[in-house]
Amino acid sequence: MPTIQQLIRSERKRVYNKTKSPALKACPQRRGVCTRVYTTTPKKPNSALRKVARVRLTSGFEVTAYIPGIGHNLQEHSVVLIRGGRVKDLPGVRYHIIRGILDTAGVKDRAQSRSKYGVKRS
């Protein structure tokens, strides 16, 4: 604990917390346009072809976002909504695309966890 003299000499430093999703600019979601849709491979112990998209956001950032679920209809120039949330085994992917809104279709034949994949009750 600092002495009074130490506090007079230099004030307490304020601790700022750094955001994990800076491209959202403190908003819950952001709209963007896909500039590239492609697959990439995950980090070491895992093996797959993960579907990702490079998205140019309304905030001016260009980010890599993960496309969740089985199958998608995204292509270049698709308008998407993204949210925060990283993908642990894909370095540099810190955002998720929200399914079932704007140009992104919901997951076909999805029965469980439907709200997470933009599927209406059948």
UniProtKB/Swiss-Prot annotation:
Q: Which locations, inside or outside the cell, does it occupy?
A: Plastid, Chloroplast
Q: Which GO terms describe its biological process?
A: translation
Q: Give the source's domain of life in one word.
A: Eukaryota
InterPro entries in alphabetical order: NA-bd_OB-fold, Ribosomal_uS12, Ribosomal_uS12_bac
- Show the GO cellular component annotation of the record: chloroplast; small ribosomal subunit
- What's the main place this protein lives? plastid
* Gene Ontology terms for molecular function: rRNA binding; structural constituent of ribosome
Which keywords annotate this record? Chloroplast, Plastid, Ribonucleoprotein, Ribosomal protein, RNA-binding, rRNA-binding
Write out the coiled-coil annotation as residue ranges: none
Q: Of which family is this protein a member?
A: Belongs to the universal ribosomal protein uS12 family.
Question: What is the role of the protein in this entry?
Answer: With S4 and S5 plays an important role in translational accuracy. Located at the interface of the 30S and 50S subunits.
Assembly, per entry: Part of the 30S ribosomal subunit.
State the name under which the record lists this protein. Small ribosomal subunit protein uS12c
From which source organism is this entry?
Mesostigma viride
